[in-house]
Amino acid sequence: MKMMKPITMVAAILFCGGATTPEPPGAPADQFFSRIAALCGRSFEGRLVTADAADAAMAGQRLVMHVADCTADRIRIPFHVGADRSRTWLITRTAAGLRLKHDHRHEDGAPDALTNYGGDTAGPGAAERQEFPVDAESIALFRREGRAASVTNVWAMEANGLLFAYELRRPAGPNVRHFRVEFDLGRAVPTPPPAWGAAGR
């Protein structure tokens, strides 16, 4: 009886076993969204890893993010800086990718004059990182509120299983900026109090 060569035998086994080509992964934006949604309900402590002078006051504060609630199309993440609970990140699905907005509130829950700014992803990005260039609505808001330095903002978020990062950059020039805070996903912390104005959002 003629014996099959090892390589031929392996090929035959795979063929007879109905081996199929793996399905292609989802869009990077969808993968990224799913990574964040998997953290829903949990809170994590972070640290400032950049050294811009504008962020000096934040350097000594306790930084906590809380993936507070998630739907199929939106994730809400309050970001607490010490006792200041005014900041919330909103990640929303769009037809082309993802949108990041910043919801800023006063302690009584009223919207700050500088709120609902951000931008949409301009490309596919990666499952681990998405970037959000400033949108036209936010540029108009920044100019109206005397924050013209912010009209070139690009925000980014990263999630790689070990850490979550939030980042702000501006290109080189008189308004150059780099802010980045990283959160350790390996150690959850107790849930902080709700963000200001969280009720009804």
Identify the role of each PLM range:
Residues F15-G26:
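Bacterial Sec-dependent signal peptides at the C-terminal "C-region" and cleavage site
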Residues P25-A54, H102:
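Tryptophan-anchored aromatic micro-motifs
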Residues E45-A72:
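Short, solvent-exposed loop/hinge segments that bridge or flank secondary-structure elements
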Residues L48, I75-G82, H102-D103, Y166-R170:
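Short beta-strand segments that buttress and anchor functional surface loops
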Residues G60-R62, D84-T88, S150-T152, V176-H178:
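Short, surface-exposed coil-to-beta transition loops
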Residues W89-L141:
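An exposed acidic His-Trp-rich patch
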Residues T115-D120, G161-R201:
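Edge beta-strand at a domain terminus
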Residues Q130-P171:
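Helix-rich interaction surfaces within compact, conserved domain-sized segments
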